[in-house]
């Protein structure tokens, strides 16, 4: 096992918080490993005055980091999964995710509590075509203007009156301790589906790096890993970019297994690693989509808490036509469900 890990990440405050959360998980299982953060400035960080769809999409937040991985300048990379395109470079793989946080969006406004309450022709700052499509579906009269930057800068722009409101991810606000209930109001899934992968921290490695794979195998939150498969399959099949209004949100129907993790079992067995391995895990399972092998928890292997419902949204390029679809599936066929939804909805949009 390696003694040191170089972890690549963006330099933003939120990205560094995400990276430290990954390090905390690594330290739970490998307390003696030295974790070195390697901050990397990406093209997406440098270009702030244009919408992402005009400059290459969300991949601009990954390009330099993934290149550092390929060049072996770092050992693993930490991303917000919502920024990761459906297709990544062939030698790389998303090998682990942390437990998903609440993926809802937040309506941020000083005077009003919802999009519906805004006055006629009010201005909302947002560069996401997904959010723009939902906003215009709810209130066609509203003007949506380009609004980029980190969480703090967007809130400052709101405070100075550049826009009447903006929409941000709850997870980012929470982790930055910037969620203020006086002007931050959660938007329910029924009104605005989250971005694919929203609320999930992802760890990317080289496929052939067995040392990093062993680490990822330990820190990977399997219930979340399974949950995002239909969302990611939907995104990958459509090869969607920042010009396409697209959203998906998956949830377990039978129960909420988000706390089904090795750490939880470790606590339950009071640190008895041998008992943990024997009682909590049934068998190895190779993931067809990544080629990686993980130990599968008994509850999931036995079919408990394994039915997934995914709500999908897809719009045409100008957002004038939006279609919705819901798939319910077992974890064994969740990837196929995402592909099925993509095919059906693409056909509906193209009619």
UniProtKB/Swiss-Prot annotation:
Gene3D superfamilies: Periplasmic binding protein-like II, Porphobilinogen deaminase, C-terminal domain. Keywords: Porphyrin biosynthesis, Transferase. Its cofactor is dipyrromethane. Its EC number is 2.5.1.61. GO terms for molecular function: hydroxymethylbilane synthase activity. It catalyses: 4 porphobilinogen + H2O = hydroxymethylbilane + 4 NH4(+). Tetrapolymerization of the monopyrrole PBG into the hydroxymethylbilane pre-uroporphyrinogen in several discrete steps. This is Porphobilinogen deaminase.
């Amino acid at each position: 096992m390696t003694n040191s890990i170089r972890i690549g990440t963006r330099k933003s405050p939120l990205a560094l918080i995400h990276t430290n959360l990954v390090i905390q998980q690594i330290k739970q299982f490998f307390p003696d490993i030295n974790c070195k953060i390697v901050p990397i400035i990406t093209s997406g960080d440098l270009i702030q005055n244009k919408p992402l769809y005009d400059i290459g999409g969300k991949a601009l937040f990954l390009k330099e980091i993934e290149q550092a991985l390929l060049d072996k300048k770092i050992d693993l990379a930490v991303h917000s999964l919502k920024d990761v395109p459906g297709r990544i470079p062939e030698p790389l793989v998303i090998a682990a995710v942390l437990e998903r946080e609440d993926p809802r969006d937040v309506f941020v406004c000083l005077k009003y509590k919802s999009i519906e309450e805004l006055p006629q022709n009010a201005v909302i700052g947002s560069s996401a075509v997904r959010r723009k499509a939902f906003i215009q579906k709810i209130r066609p009269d509203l003007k949506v203007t380009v609004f980029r930057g980190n969480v703090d800068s967007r809130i400052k722009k709101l405070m100075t009156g550049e826009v009447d409101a903006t929409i941000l991810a709850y997870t980012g606000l929470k982790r930055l301790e910037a969620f203020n209930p006086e002007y931050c109001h959660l938007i329910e899934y029924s009104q605005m589906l989250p971005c694919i992968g929203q609320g999930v921290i992802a760890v990317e490695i080289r496929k052939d790096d067995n040392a990093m794979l062993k680490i990822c195998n330990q820190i990977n939150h399997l219930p979340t890993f399974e949950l995002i498969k239909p969302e990611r399959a939907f995104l990958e099949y459509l090869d969607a970019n920042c010009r396409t209004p697209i959203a998906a949100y998956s949830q377990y129907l039978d129960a909420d297994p988000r706390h089904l993790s090795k750490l939880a079992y470790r606590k339950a067995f009071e640190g008895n690693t041998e008992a943990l391995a024997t009682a909590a895990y049934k068998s190895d399972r190779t993931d067809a989509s990544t080629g990686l092998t993980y130990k599968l928890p008994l509850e999931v292997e036995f079919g408990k808490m394994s039915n997934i419902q995914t709500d999908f949204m897809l719009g045409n390029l100008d957002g004038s036509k939006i279609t919705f679809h819901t798939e319910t599936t077992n974890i064994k066929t969740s990837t196929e469900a995402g592909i099925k939804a993509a095919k059906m909805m693409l056909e509906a949009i193209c009619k």
